[in-house]
C-alpha cells in the first residue's frame, strides 16, 4: 500500500489517499493543541504515542466484536484505516465529573457518576464544537434519530469495555470522546482515535492525570504521562 497525496490535515493527524479507494493512510502529528487551538505546541514523540495507544485500544475493541476503521499499524506514527464518511458529531461519554461538565453543573471535579452520561457535540471549529441535544441534531440534519441511537449504544458499549480494560491497568477512565463514520454499505463504525488526547485518564489511587489535561493545565511533561499509559497498556515504551 502506497501513501499518495494529502487529503486533509487536522490538528493532530494528516490523512492521505492510497491506491485503494476503500483505505486511507493516517499519520499522527507531534502537535498539541487545547482550547480550540488557542494553545499550541510541538511535542516530540506525541504522534508515536497516540498511534501506539490507539492501535492497542482499537485492537482490543475489535477483539470483543466492536467494528472500527482500523486495519493495521504501518509505522510508529502511521496506520492504515478504512475510508468512511465521518458523522460530524463528537460523542462524549462521562463516568466522572471533570472539565467542562464540572463548570456547567457546578459539581466538584472527581465526583463519580451513578451511571454514564452521553453527550453530543457538533463538529464545527467556527462554532467551537457546541454541545447539542438530539433535537438540535435533527434540525442540523447531520444524523438520523436511528443513527443517534446507534451512536449512543455503541458509545456505552465501548465505555464498558474500556472501563474494564483501563481498570486492569490501575487507570480510571474519567471521560472520553469518540467519532464515528459510515461505510459505503451504510454501516456505522468507530473511527478517529482513542488516546490520551481524547480521554481523561487518572491513576486509580492518586488521581494523577495521564492525559491532555497535563498540557491544558501545565501539570508536567506530556510525553511522560502518555508513556505511562502506553506502558500500563502493555505497549513498548521508549523511556
Curated annotation (Swiss-Prot):
Coiled coil: which residue ranges? none
User: What GO molecular function annotation could you give as one example from this UniProt entry?
Assistant: ATP binding
Q: In which pathway does it act?
A: Purine metabolism; IMP biosynthesis via de novo pathway; 5-amino-1-(5-phospho-D-ribosyl)imidazole-4-carboxamide from 5-amino-1-(5-phospho-D-ribosyl)imidazole-4-carboxylate: step 1/2
Write down the chemical reaction(s) this protein catalyses.
5-amino-1-(5-phospho-D-ribosyl)imidazole-4-carboxylate + L-aspartate + ATP = (2S)-2-[5-amino-1-(5-phospho-beta-D-ribosyl)imidazole-4-carboxamido]succinate + ADP + phosphate + 2 H(+)
Query: What is a biological process (GO) this protein takes part in?
Result: 'de novo' IMP biosynthetic process
Give the domain of life: Bacteria
Q: What class does this enzyme belong to in the EC scheme?
A: ligase
> EC no.?
6.3.2.6
Classification via Pfam families = SAICAR_synt
Q: Which UniProt keywords apply?
A: ATP-binding, Ligase, Nucleotide-binding, Purine biosynthesis
Family annotation (PROSITE patterns) = SAICAR_SYNTHETASE_1 (PS01057), SAICAR_SYNTHETASE_2 (PS01058)
Record CDD domains: SAICAR_synt_PurC
Question: Does this UniProt record's set of keywords contain Disulfide bond?
Answer: no
Family of the protein in this entry: Belongs to the SAICAR synthetase family.
Q: Can you say what this protein is called?
A: Phosphoribosylaminoimidazole-succinocarboxamide synthase
Its taxonomic path starts at: Bacteria, Bacillati, Bacillota, Bacilli, Bacillales
Q: Which gene encodes it?
A: purC
Amino acid at each position: 500500500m502506497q501513501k499518495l497525496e494529502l487529503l486533509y490535515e487536522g490538528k493532530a493527524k494528516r490523512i492521505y489517499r492510497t491506491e485503494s479507494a476503500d483505505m486511507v493512510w493516517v499519520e499522527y502529528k507531534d502537535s498539541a493543541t487545547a482550547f480550540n487551538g488557542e494553545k499550541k505546541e510541538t511535542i516530540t514523540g506525541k504522534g508515536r504515542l497516540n498511534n501506539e495507544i490507539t492501535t492497542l485500544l482499537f485492537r482490543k475493541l475489535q477483539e470483543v466484536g466492536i467494528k472500527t476503521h482500523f486495519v493495521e499499524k504501518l509505522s510508529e506514527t502511521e496506520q492504515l484505516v478504512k475510508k468512511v464518511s465521518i458523522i460530524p458529531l463528537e460523542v462524549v461519554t462521562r463516568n466522572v465529573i471533570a472539565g467542562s461538565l464540572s463548570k456547567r453543573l457546578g459539581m466538584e471535579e472527581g465526583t463519580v457518576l451513578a451511571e454514564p452520561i452521553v453527550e453530543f457535540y457538533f463538529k464545527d471549529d467556527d462554532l467551537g464544537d457546541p454541545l447539542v441535544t438530539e433535537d438540535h441534531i435533527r434540525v442540523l440534519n447531520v444524523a438520523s434519530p436511528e443513527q443517534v441511537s446507534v451512536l449512543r449504544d455503541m458509545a456505552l458499549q465501548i465505555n464498558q469495555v474500556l472501563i474494564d480494560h483501563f481498570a486492569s491497568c490501575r487507570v480510571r477512565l474519567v471521560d472520553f470522546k469518540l467519532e464515528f463514520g459510515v461505510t459505503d454499505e451504510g454501516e456505522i463504525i468507530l473511527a478517529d482515535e482513542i488516546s490520551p488526547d481524547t480521554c481523561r485518564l487518572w491513576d486509580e489511587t492518586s488521581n494523577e492525570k495521564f492525559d491532555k489535561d497535563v498540557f491544558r493545565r501545565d501539570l508536567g511533561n506530556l510525553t511522560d504521562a502518555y508513556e505511562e499509559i502506553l506502558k500500563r497498556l502493555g505497549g513498548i515504551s521508549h523511556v
